[in-house]
């Protein structure tokens, strides 16, 4: 039996953001970004080329009458084996991603960076509010890209995100341009990114469907899947004076940490959380169902952390094709 719905106040609102007028059109998107020529109409009515291995939806809500969908702004469940969208709530609606942004940051870093390269943390990267999500890095610290990626995904460090962006591209603005370029290449055309950490900006937004596109590309990388499924990581690095520093970073994912239990038949691999006042509580989760099908499930703008996991368990129980043990 699933737990009861929580009455929540505080971070996040349950109402959805403004939806985009048009749903995602694979043919038009492929033409716009020159994946096919403007004259090529042979594939106009098919999902070959751009979306042949993707879950595709017409944008109509699906399954929401059997869930407590009012606790979140948007959600979706995607079966990567059957290529089906099994649950859809406002999946093309404009949402603020908070730290789920770091999925794309990691994807770009893994594509363009070298895991063994060592970066020095700048004053800009270290200058993060202590009450925000940080790895407690100091100006002048030396860490490898691989280490910074653990801090980015597990600890959700905003400082690690800036250090990665500056290490890859020289500055945050140039890295954000690269993020937008890669997002569009993946078909995530209803998104725009301003920074690598997801701190709120009116012009920093995405959709559930775009996050699915980005995340499904990221999980093809073995290093990324290693990052999202790690519960605890001990990092050793040097500070600006050459002295050894050790920290222990913990995952922010309650399923991994054992403080939340998924429904029977579901095996949680990992994922990424995100929270800001404007974004609410967000979770992108990678799991398998009892048939072994890989599942991506996403919730954005939940009204509190308890309802985020309550709603996620509803989605896993009812729409990942599993039964509770």
Explain the meaning of each model-derived region.
Residues 1-15:
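Sec-dependent N-terminal signal peptides of Gram-positive bacterial secreted proteins and lipoproteins
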Residues 16-209, 218-219:
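Active-site-adjacent loops and short helices of periplasmic peptidoglycan-processing enzymes
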Residues 4-7, 51, 243:
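Secretory pathway export signals and precursors
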Residues 7-9, 48, 73, 137, ...:
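Generic detector of intrinsically disordered, low-complexity, polar/charged segments
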Residues 11-15, 188-189, 202-205, 209-210, ...:
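Domain-terminus/edge residues, biased toward the C-terminal soluble/receptor-binding domains
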């Amino acid at each position: 039996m699933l737990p009861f719905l929580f009455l929540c106040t505080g971070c996040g609102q349950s109402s959805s953001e403004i939806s985009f007028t048009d749903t995602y059109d694979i043919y038009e998107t492929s033409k716009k970004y020159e994946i096919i020529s403007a004259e090529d109409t042979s594939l106009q009515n098919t999902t070959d080329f751009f979306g042949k291995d993707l879950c595709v939806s017409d944008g109509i809500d699906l399954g929401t009458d059997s869930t407590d969908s009012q606790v979140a702004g948007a959600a979706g469940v995607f079966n990567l084996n059957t290529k089906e969208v099994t649950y859809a709530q406002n999946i093309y609606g404009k949402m603020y991603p908070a730290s789920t942004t770091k999925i794309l940051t990691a994807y770009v870093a893994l594509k363009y960076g070298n895991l063994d390269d060592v970066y020095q943390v700048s004053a800009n990267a270290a200058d993060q509010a202590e009450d925000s999500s940080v790895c407690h890095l100091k100006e002048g610290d030396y860490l490898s890209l691989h280490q910074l990626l653990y801090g980015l995904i597990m600890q959700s460090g905003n400082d690690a995100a800036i250090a990665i962006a500056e290490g890859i591209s020289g500055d945050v603005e140039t890295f954000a341009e690269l993020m937008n370029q890669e997002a569009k290449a993946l078909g995530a055309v209803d998104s725009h990114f301003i920074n690598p950490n997801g701190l709120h900006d009116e012009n920093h937004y995405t959709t559930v469907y775009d996050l699915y596109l980005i995340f499904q590309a990221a999980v093809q990388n073995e290093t990324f899947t290693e990052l999202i499924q790690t519960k605890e990581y001990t990092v050793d690095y040097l500070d600006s004076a050459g002295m050894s520093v050790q920290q222990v970073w913990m995952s922010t994912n309650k399923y991994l940490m054992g403080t939340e239990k998924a429904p029977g038949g579901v095996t949680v691999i990992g994922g990424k959380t995100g929270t800001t006042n404007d974004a609410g509580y967000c979770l992108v989760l990678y799991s398998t169902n009892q048939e072994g099908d890989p599942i991506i499930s996403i919730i954005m703008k939940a009204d509190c952390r308890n309802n985020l996991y309550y709603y996620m368990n509803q989605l896993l129980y009812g729409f990942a094709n599993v039964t509770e043990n």
